[in-house]
Amino acid sequence: MDFTLSKKHEMARQLFKEFAENEVKPLAQEVDETEHFPEETVAKMQKLGFMGIPVPKEYGGQGCDPLTYIMCVEELSKVCGTTGVIVSAHTSLCADPILTYGTEEQKQKYLVPLAKGEKLGAFGLTEPGAGTDAQGQQTKAVFDEATNEWVLNGSKCFITNGKYADVYIVIAVTGKVEKRGRMMKEISAFIVEKGTPGFTFGTKEKKMGIRGSATYELIFEDCRIPAEIGRAHV
């Protein structure tokens, strides 16, 4: 098997490497020591198209293959773990689920600005009592037929990009179903925008490393999500 990079891939890797060395590395120590979220670096990456590398061009991305995206995250992470995880959480955990499972309307409304870097994404699954075990989570969304809305209650912890994100994929329990002789929780993913009433931020975590990635608690108290955002349990 030949693992040699193509000329196109090598050019992309060199672009990522030069950006990381010239723009990211000089700030890395300060970012980590001061827990500073590097908004200025994110803005530069937006202009270069780093925030939507694997997203198809028709949705505002660069239309590159997974290897190109991996090389970007790798080169950024070599010099600054914070910057690498900001990009990977935004792309893999927020933009990609919308690309893979979202409706066309959701892709136009959320994926396009995410891929262009106009908005930052985050993903909320982890909870204090369950970790990343989706079946163990306590966050729930109940459908309100009177208003045609989902009402979201619960909290998430250790969420990368925290309060700096604009669009969040939030996982919640939306029902129960019997499978293989036992009751299982039905799980749904919701797109929640920053500023939605009932959605606030809690603790900012103190970490041993990757300290600039703004790891926050997300709190949902009767947070209402329009039903047209999509179907449950899919």
Region spans (language model):
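Amphipathic, small/basic residue-rich leader segments at the start of a protein or domain
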Residues: 1-88, 105-109, 113-116, 120, ...
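Glycine-rich phosphate/pyrophosphate-binding beta-alpha loops
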Residues: 81, 130-131, 157-162, 209-210
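A short, Trp-centered hydrophobic/proline-enriched beta-strand micro-motif
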Residues: 117-125, 171
